[in-house]
A protein has these predicted regions:
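OB/S1-fold single-stranded nucleic-acid-binding modules
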Residues: 1-56, 150-152
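OB-fold/S1-family single-stranded nucleic acid-binding modules
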Residues: 119-151
Length: 152
């Protein structure tokens, strides 16, 4: 049997150097300018407001505000929601085998309970992007993300 060499993960110093290099690239400069802009600050503040719910994967009350994502979105299936007065993209990804069937029954102004493990943002979007892991309406679960196959 041959032993494959497993590349060791980069050190903290290597990761820091790689980040500095990326920040100096055109993409890095654009992202940092966006983060400093009023629109970027608004998105980052919205993400920060729900960070504790995300890290603890606790329930968040949301209201569906739109059944479609902003024009040009490339996030798969999702809806727009309002959580504590701020708007968010609630994204579920690409649909495989009708797993989102019950989510298609959502209507504007529906009050839902959501849970997520991840919130992200990108200069292309004017709202933080919440990964939908769990959705409940009228005390009934209408979506629960299946655990990943093969671990984590």
């Amino acid at each position: 049997t041959s032993k494959k060499s497993i590349p060791k993960p980069p050190s903290a110093a290597e990761m820091k150097a790689a980040r500095k290099k990326w920040e100096a690239s055109p993409d890095g400069i654009m992202v940092n300018k966006w983060k400093a802009s009023p629109e970027g600050q608004k998105v980052l503040a919205g993400a920060a407001k729900i960070r504790n719910h995300i890290s603890d994967s606790t329930n968040m009350e949301a209201v569906v505000t739109s059944l479609s994502l902003p024009p040009g979105s490339r996030l798969g299936f999702g809806v727009m929601v309002r959580i504590n007065g701020d708007d968010y993209i609630l994204s579920f990804g690409l649909e495989e085998s009708n797993e989102f069937q019950q989510l298609h029954s959502l209507k504007v102004n529906d009050k839902i309970i959501i849970r997520s493990h991840f919130v992200s943002y990108a200069p292309k979007y004017s709202y933080p992007i919440v990964a939908g892991d769990y959705v409940e309406r009228d005390s009934k679960i209408i979506y629960k993300r299946a655990p990943r196959k093969g671990g984590c």
